[in-house]
Amino acid sequence: MKITLQNLGKRYNREWIFRHIEYEFIVGKKYAITGSNGSGKSTLLQVIAGSLMHNEGNVEISSQQWAVGSGQLANTTKNKHQTISNEQHYQYISIATPYLELIEEMTALEMLRFHSTFKQLILPAAEILQIVNLQASANKQIRYYSSGMKQRLKLALAFFSKTPILLLDEPTTNLDEDGIALYHQLIKNYTTNKLVIVCSNDKQEYSFCEEALEMGRYK
C-alpha cells in the first residue's frame, strides 16, 4: 500500500498554503511532516485523509498487498497496484488529531463500540481501555474527561483500528509524561506493517520516523 502525492496544492482564497508537492509514502515505513506553525502541516494531513479538498494535483492511495479488515498483509497478488477510489479512502485510514471531535454524551466504552461499527478493532474495547489506562473511567461520559484522557481515547481509536494507514497530528497534545510514554509504547507495539505519518514540529513526537517531508519547501 502507498500514498502518492502528485503536484499537490492547496489554497485558501488566493493564498497558496502549499504547492507542487511530489511525494510517496509506503506501507511499513514511518514519516514525519514537519514545519513551523502555519506552514500547512495539518492542512496537508487533512487533504491526505480526505477531509479537505485540494485545489490542484492528486492524492492517490493504491493497495498492493493489504487485505482491508484483516489487519495483516495478504499473500495474494490480485490486489497489487490497485488504485482505491476516493470514496473508499476512509476504510484504509485511521487518524488522531486535536481537532477530532469525540461524542461527549457517550462513555469511552460506547465510543469504541460505536467506532467499531465503521472500522474493526484489533482488540475488544475493554482491553483497549485497559491498555490506554482508561479502564477506571470506561463508563463515564466523555464530557467529564480531562483533556489528557480525551487524547488517550483519540489515540486508542486510531491505533486499534484495523487499517493500514495511521495519521497522527500533534499526537502528544495534552498528554503528561505517562501519556507520552504510552504514545511511544503504542508506536512500538501496534504499528508493525503500517504506514505511519506524524504531523509535528516537536521531535519527541516523530523521533522514530525514517523520513521527513519539510513543508517549508513547498510554499
Language-model-derived ranges and their functions:
Residues 49:
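Helix-to-loop junction immediately C-terminal to a conserved catalytic motif
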Residues 3, 18-20:
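Conserved structural motif at the start of ABC-family nucleotide-binding domains
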Residues 37, 169, 176:
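ABC-family nucleotide-binding domains
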Residues 155:
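Hydrophobic anchor residue at the start of the ABC signature
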Residues 113, 123-137:
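Conserved ABC ATPase "signature" region
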Residues 57-66, 73-91:
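Conserved ABC transporter NBD signature motif
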Residues 99, 104-119:
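Q-loop/switch helix immediately C-terminal to the Walker
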